[in-house]
Amino acid sequence: RDVAPSRGLGDVYKRQLQTTPELTADNVLSGKFMTEVENYTSDQILLRDFWTGARSALQRLEGRQDISGTYLGADGRYFAKVTDDTFNWDNYQKNLAAVETFFTANDGKRCTALIVPSPAGVLRDSLPEDAPYYDEDRAFAMLEEHLGTAFADARQALAGVADPYYHTDHHWTTAGAQAAYHIWAEATGHTARSYALVQATDRFRGTLYSKVLLPDSVYDEVDYCPDITIESADCDGTVTDSLYDMTALEKKDKYELFLGGNYAKAVLRTGVENGKHLLLIKDSFANSLVPFLCGDYETITMVDLRYCREKIQPLADEADDVLVLYEITNFAADGNLFKLNLK
């Protein structure tokens, strides 16, 4: 059965859409069959996206402000819908306890948790009126209770940034990441550096856009810091000499500009000769913040517990400082924090 009608909407894409490929010996031998299969698959995805966008536009006309688990906020901002019922409070409590235990086991090191507020927590005024949202104040109170002074609170700093998060993606902007870096520096006794941000692209639509596919969605600018350089980055065995993957700018997910995406373990050699080593336990929010940390450490080991199979304590033993960096709803949902304390 066809995924979508084999004809139709061709004028939308300025060409006739590929019909179902015909399987014949001549077509297979000539290579025509595989070419038509590729075109057909591509066209069905285009049709699916078209209908998703059309459905979202109709729902918006009907007054819906919650489409496919995404709130349509003010100023073209989209927010992931997270309520008290969907925020994983039990797992959040377990993860806080896991980090607390890990920090206690490494009390001879400077251990910091930078748990990032969700976009809607900072930009509450941009949420649709009366939109249900989880109690982030309660979540941060629990953070402070478990981690005390080891918790670096970036909420106020992010609220002072003009665009701390992308409009159509769940990540923070580079400006937001830099503001949080200043909070980390203050909390850990480092002298914060300020870097000029340079536009890498102004054509970014992110993960939340992909859920609604509204054609009038905002494009975001993605900035980076070309002045920050390193000697090498070993990302799961692939070695590069840059913090930035410029080829990501030609792809859909332009946030992969930062290190090219997520890895089980990435080891950065910064070229700073101070002998200091940071262990960074992280989600994808850290990818755009880590460049700002490179001036303070000779080595930074980044670990994503979703993919890493190594024991973490031996990595901590090699480090001078530890930073746990997650966006708060990612932190609550992650089922891998127990790995911190595996012996």
What is the predicted role of each segment?
Residues L17-A98, G121-E129:
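Serine-dependent acyl-ester chemistry module
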Residues Y78-M142, A264-I300, L305-R309, D321-V322, ...:
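Conserved, well-ordered alpha-helix/loop/beta-strand core segments that scaffold catalytic motifs
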Residues H170-W172, G176-H277, K282-I300, R306-R309, ...:
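Extracellular/periplasmic envelope-modification machinery, especially enzymes
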Residues S126-E136, V161, H167-T174:
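Long, hydrophobic, well-ordered secondary-structure blocks that form the structural core
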Residues D2-Y13:
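Short, small-residue-biased leader/transition segments that mark boundaries at the very start
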Residues K109-P117, Y133-D163, I183-E186, T191:
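Extracellular serine-dependent O-acyl
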